């Protein structure tokens, strides 16, 4: 073919590089109910206009590339491209902007969190025109939500399975997290459950190591569960971590847990991956297992305020992928969490409909159209003196998880569990009687400790423990 011959596909095609904003910045665009909406915190490189930066994000996370290509003429860019439809400055921050981007629903595979994230955040975060980029929030349209199964069971079904109502659930992470033999590990589980806890937990990095292979751990923990249930008359559980190096091995562990008749298994959803997590969630629903989710590795992604992905987005993704519990910070313990922001994504986990509320970091109204809710788990450096605040902040639909705050009791694991259960029951009773947990919390705990020697001992041990550090994300 002669170099001068013009094909139909090349009509109107002009090679070269053009500004993203000419195609992808569309402030006149009216968003559709079926669009996935994203709010990005954008920090452009010096000299890059915010409109160009926002348009670049929209382009590189949808149909764009660095140059004009002739195959653009073979499809409808207007139908498939992402659009930066609004930009606003971030108050109090120099050269930072919130760029709002709308994505057509046809860009995403149904029921795949993996594909959604691959498109929206898979490539654009290394873009040279940006100094930093953070995904602050997503609006998932109802049409897309309905393609997901979501949590295996949800909050109400879990309460019915456990026959426990009107209070937060109590848990404990077995410590030391690594090094115990399976038999000693099972003994610690039994003591905690016998003392009054609802759940005990594998730590996130307990998988199948030389000192404790997974099958041995599962067997001894199942024995502990059944023994504690027989003695207390309550349904008990232990989060058996099924996370493994392959999906096949993960499923083998989940199947063995089901055969043992235990109520719940666990997965590290970020290190394990969304595809593995969704696979496990589907199995758990089909086989009556609850699924506890640990967020190991989240701070690598969400801790910095100007780069990464906010945890509220990871929480939404988990609700879509599937999990009945997820760790959500404490506000009061050793791990970071601002109260209003934390409660914002806690509501996104539990509630069916959440209104836009920028004061709590919620950029979009979200309708989950009856997708089951997820119980937030508060854990990390908490003890009995935190119980009133935790009960007030998280409410009944939560799991309060005390690791060192149970196993660090001077009299042992079972008395540590007793102390936590007594403290919780005292706080719930006081709240139900109309007392203010925020102002009277310490008094409520002291009153309960007068008739519970286990609680009195715990109060004495942890009376001066505080975690007061400056947040590193101010750097």
Swiss-Prot record:
It catalyses: 2 (2R)-3-phosphoglycerate + 2 H(+) = D-ribulose 1,5-bisphosphate + CO2 + H2O; D-ribulose 1,5-bisphosphate + O2 = 2-phosphoglycolate + (2R)-3-phosphoglycerate + 2 H(+). GO terms for biological process: photorespiration; reductive pentose-phosphate cycle. RuBisCO catalyzes two reactions: the carboxylation of D-ribulose 1,5-bisphosphate, the primary event in carbon dioxide fixation, as well as the oxidative fragmentation of the pentose substrate in the photorespiration process. Both reactions occur simultaneously and in competition at the same active site. The modification N6,N6,N6-trimethyllysine is found at residue 14. Its cofactor is Mg(2+). The record marks 334 as: Transition state stabilizer. The basic functional RuBisCO is composed of a large chain homodimer in a 'head-to-tail' conformation. In form I RuBisCO this homodimer is arranged in a barrel-like tetramer with the small subunits forming a tetrameric 'cap' on each end of the 'barrel'. The disulfide bond which can form in the large chain dimeric partners within the hexadecamer appears to be associated with oxidative stress and protein turnover. The keyword DNA repair does not apply. It is an enzyme of class 4 (lyase). Its EC number is 4.1.1.39. Residues 1-2 form a propeptide. InterPro entries: RuBisCO, RuBisCo_large_chain_AS, RuBisCO_lsu_C, RuBisCO_lsu_C_sf, RuBisCO_lsu_fd_N, RuBisCO_lsu_N_sf, RuBisCO_lsuI. The modification N-acetylproline is found at residue 3. SUPFAM superfamilies: RuBisCo, C-terminal domain (SSF51649), RuBisCO, large subunit, small (N-terminal) domain (SSF54966). One of its GO terms (cellular component) is chloroplast. The gene is rbcL. It holds the Pfam family RuBisCO_large. This is Ribulose bisphosphate carboxylase large chain. The modification N6-carboxylysine is found at residue 201. Mg(2+) binds at residues 201, 203-204.
């Amino acid at each position: 073919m002669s170099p001068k011959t013009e094909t139909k596909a090349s009509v109107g095609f002009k090679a070269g590089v053009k500004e993203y904003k000419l195609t992808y910045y569309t402030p006149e665009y009216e968003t559709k109910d079926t669009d996935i909406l994203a709010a990005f915190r954008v920090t452009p490189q010096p000299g890059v206009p915010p409109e160009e930066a926002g348009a670049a994000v929209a382009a590189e996370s949808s149909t764009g590339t660095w140059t004009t290509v002739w195959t653009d003429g073979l499809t409808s860019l207007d139908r498939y491209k992402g659009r930066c439809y609004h930009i606003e400055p971030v108050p109090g921050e120099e050269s930072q902007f919130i760029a709002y981007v709308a994505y057509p629903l046809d860009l995403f595979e149904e029921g795949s969190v993996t594909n959604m994230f691959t498109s929206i955040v898979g490539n654009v975060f290394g873009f040279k025109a940006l100094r930093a980029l953070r995904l602050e929030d997503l609006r998932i349209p109802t049409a897309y939500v309905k393609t997901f199964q979501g949590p295996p069971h949800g909050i109400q079904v879990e309460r019915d399975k456990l026959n426990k109502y009107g209070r937060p659930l109590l848990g404990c992470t077995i410590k030391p997290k690594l090094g115990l033999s399976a038999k000693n590990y099972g003994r610690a589980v039994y003591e905690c459950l016998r003392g009054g806890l609802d759940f005990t937990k594998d730590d996130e990095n307990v998988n199948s190591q030389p000192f404790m292979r997974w099958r041995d751990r599962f067997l001894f923990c199942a024995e502990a569960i059944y023994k504690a249930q027989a003695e207390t008359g309550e349904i008990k559980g232990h989060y058996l971590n099924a996370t493994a190096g392959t999906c096949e091995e993960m499923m083998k562990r989940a199947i063995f847990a089901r055969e043992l008749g235990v109520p719940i298994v666990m997965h590290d959803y970020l290190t394990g991956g969304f595809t593995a997590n969704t696979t496990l969630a589907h199995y758990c629903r089909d086989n009556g297992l609850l699924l506890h989710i640990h967020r190991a590795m989240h701070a690598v992604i969400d801790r910095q305020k100007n780069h990464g992905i906010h945890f509220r987005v990871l929480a939404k993704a988990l609700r879509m992928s599937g999990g009945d519990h997820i760790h959500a910070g404490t506000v009061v313990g050793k791990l970071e969490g601002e109260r209003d922001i934390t409660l914002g994504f806690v509501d996104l986990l539990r509630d069916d409909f959440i209104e836009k509320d920028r004061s709590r970091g919620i950029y979009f109204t979200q309708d989950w159209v009856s997708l089951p809710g997820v119980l937030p788990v508060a854990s990390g450096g908490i003890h009995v003196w935190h119980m009133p605040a935790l009960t007030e902040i998280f409410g009944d639909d939560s799991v309060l998880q005390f690791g060192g705050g149970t196993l660090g009791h001077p009299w042992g694991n079972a008395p540590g569990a007793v102390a936590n259960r007594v403290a919780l029951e005292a706080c719930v009773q006081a709240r139900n009687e109309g007392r203010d947990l925020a102002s009277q919390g310490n008094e409520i705990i002291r009153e309960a400790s007068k008739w519970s020697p286990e609680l009195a001992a715990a109060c004495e041990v942890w009376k001066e423990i505080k975690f007061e550090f400056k947040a590193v994300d101010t750097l």
